Amino acid sequence: LAHRRMMQPPFHHGNLDSYVAIMHNLVNEHTKDWQDKKSIELAPEMMALTLEIVSRCLFGLDSHQYTKAIAESMEVAIDRIERTMLPGLERFDKSGIKYFKEFEVASDRLVEIAEAIISKRIESKEVKNDDLLGILLQMKGEISVDHIRDEVLTLILSGHETTANVMSWAFSYLSKNPKVRKQLEDEADAASWIKENRTPTYQELEDSSPVASAILQETMRLAPPVWIAPRIATEDCTIDGIKIPKGAHVLVSQYVTHRNARFFPEPEKWDPSRWADANFEKSLPRGSYFPFGGGSRKCLGEYFAIAEARLILLMVAKNF
């Protein structure tokens, strides 16, 4: 919990307006040449855009020089990280087997990038506490440089790949649902900040995006940003007659739970309209919908990610 408190300040609601301004500029900048192309490869575009947003907002950094290296290393690293839940797999990490060797190379590369980001910030002598990296660097006497590096790596890994995947799935679902796509386009056309070509506040973005929000909620139901949450039982317990001993590895799957027909009628159908009633989510039992996790380990960047995704959806719907 102490670690969580240390990481909370950059994600407070009071910072969201400044983040939305940065996001707005970066989405404009990143998508300006899309009009000249017949088609684009959306997944890598979303990866690059969300990396730019996280880098600029949380690290005060232009990420262009690292985009390709991070993308290549992330693909290898995430595959291995997702297999962490397989007991005993870590014994093979230093085995020299090709798969594990590739992970070691990718991991080392990401560490080098994180260290370069930190060094560049220190050399710039701009160690202000107006973003996450600045806050961490001002605590250098209390936490080690290795700790700071690990936090930067965690945010690079968790702060852009998850959002990029959700966006790719959202646009995929929209491409197959012209009625919902038209609703989103109408919402973008009606947004005053888009009409006036200006940056919205966080509240203005939230108020102008009920359709975009429903699209995101339904997309995260069927294609959650994290599909499984590994946990370790802290005490002996019994669930539905099954005894779970203290120390047991327990896997809780968003992907499976979000498809439970008891909570979501026609669970395999992508239907944003189910979220149109504001009371629908409130009526769901605790733990039936948790795209950002839950409890004391719930994702700190939830509102940051939702603002980013709403903005991308509306701006792309308006311009393309």
Predicted regions and their residues:
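Active-site rim elements
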Residues: 39, 97-104, 202-205, 296-302
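Cytochrome P450 catalytic-core helices
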Residues: 50, 162-187, 302-319
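Cytochrome P450 I-helix active-site segment
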Residues: 20, 24, 72-77, 126-135, ...
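Cytochrome P450 heme-thiolate monooxygenase catalytic core
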Residues: 2, 15-166, 183, 188, ...
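Cytochrome P450 proximal C-terminal region
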Residues: 27, 75-76, 189-193, 235, ...
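Conserved cytochrome P450 K-helix/beta-meander segment immediately N-terminal to the heme-binding cysteine loop
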Residues: 134, 252-281
